[in-house]
């Protein structure tokens, strides 16, 4: 079969969360394949750190989250040229406690885009998360029959896991592509504040103080700071 990058030659590619760490890198990668027929979906305030992530990217259109969801809910003719959705937009805070917000922004939003994509013959790639695996003791095997046993440790993980479970129940998993990211770091994450990667925070700490703070250990066989 043809590669995903080859398929991006056709029609519009939508990247949700396109101004974020991963989304901006994905658009940069697509641009490097000489493709610019991209719609970027994100919330970007003028003069924000997020807006800076867009400076060197090429895309045809930028839409806010609410605007895009509305077009999808109406099955608007405006969307007829879309051939691929790369859905990376979500609340990625592992400490978020507003369950209703996570349910709407992470679960329902993904469900809406997936259903629309399947109804319209659009390729759908979405970000799940390694947070769905919980503490790892139940394995990390994403075979269909294994997915249900996972026990995420936080509401963010559950918001992602709920969609994976729905996709399995509805028989969507062989028609869509889910990506489970572990720790991601690199350029364009400054806007994430306290949710930046360990690498980003450590670099800043070392540059300022010559030292870095490590996480406390939650396992008896590793002392604090000795995790590897």
Annotate each language-model stretch with its function:
Residues 65-66, 70-105:
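NAD(P)H-binding glycine-rich loop region in Rossmannoid oxidoreductase-like domains
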